[in-house]
Amino acid sequence: MASAVPLKSQLNNNSWNNHWGKTSDVAAYDASATHVKTLNHFWKNRFSAISLERNKLLDIASGGGALLETLVRQDCILPEKLSEFYSADLSYSALRSVKSKYPLSKVLQTNCAQLPFKNESFNFIISQFGIEYCGLSAFKECSRVLRKDGRFIAICHYQDGAIQAECERNLKVLYALSDIDFFAHARRAFNAKDDKMSGDFSIKIDATFRNALYDVSDLVTRQPYAAGGQLLRLFNDTRYMYENLTRFDTSAVLHWLTKMEEELTNYQERMILMLQSSLNNLSLNKAVEAFTANGVRNVKIDVLSANRNFKPFAWAIEVF
């Protein structure tokens, strides 16, 4: 078994780490989403009859530990009863969050398509909306490090499903925000107001920015919860600060605008990655073949949906 390596920050500039380090932890669904009840039921059902005592478990592409939190909260996992459990992810910031919440977890900053573990190291490997981002090689690596009598359980994004539709709606709004060029107009307007510019030039800057605000207001009206509610926050806070600029330091406002732009850009990149990595029938079969190619294993595939009236949102893959 490989030993856990100290967290390092050399990967801080990758887009995956940007999502965890610079943005709010906004997933494709939020804590109130109907999908969450389905996910909780799935994991509770799978682990209710399984004893993990003295077993070794790997949460691959763990992110900030959302799956681990679900399992612990539902008493599916008692960390102190496990022989070892690892959270592996590319993001330093995400793993730091895992370690702060679950000190017993061994965190490993690594490319999940190149796991530094010996063959047949783990009894259980789990993932929720993570492994598919790492490509087919990550499934092959899981097959390699999973014991012959072990169990692999993963929830993966379903192509053309409910979450993908939500991602596409979010992207459409963010592309529209980019077309408005809102942040550039906002910076010019705040600077002009702070410098107490007068005359036609200042009036033009103010009018242009107010038009941009109106356009964002229209986006918010049509999609009030877009980008995890960040677009609504951007509109409300920017408008308030502009109308009450004497109460704020302009440099602090400009810094806030930069951070908001980074956050929305990183959220947009996250949505794009999600669309690119969601599995269709062909890619799902290739993922399963990673386990069956080197020996006979039992495979169970389920399709998860919030209810019969909604599109599926995820594949549930079990190998045992």
At which residue positions do the language-model features occur?
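Class I SAM-dependent methyltransferase Rossmann-like catalytic core
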Residues: 2-48
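Class I SAM-dependent methyltransferase SAM/SAH-binding core
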Residues: 56-114
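A short acidic, Gly/Pro-enriched loop at the edge of an enzyme's catalytic core
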Residues: 113-125
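A short, conserved alpha-helix within the catalytic core of class I
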Residues: 133-142
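Conserved beta-strand signature within the Rossmann-like core of class I S-adenosyl-L-methionine
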Residues: 149-158
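Conserved Class I S-adenosyl-L-methionine
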Residues: 167-197
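Substrate-binding/catalytic lobe of Class I Rossmann-like enzymes that use SAM or dcSAM, i.e.
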Residues: 186-297
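Core SAM-dependent methyltransferase catalytic element
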Residues: 303-320
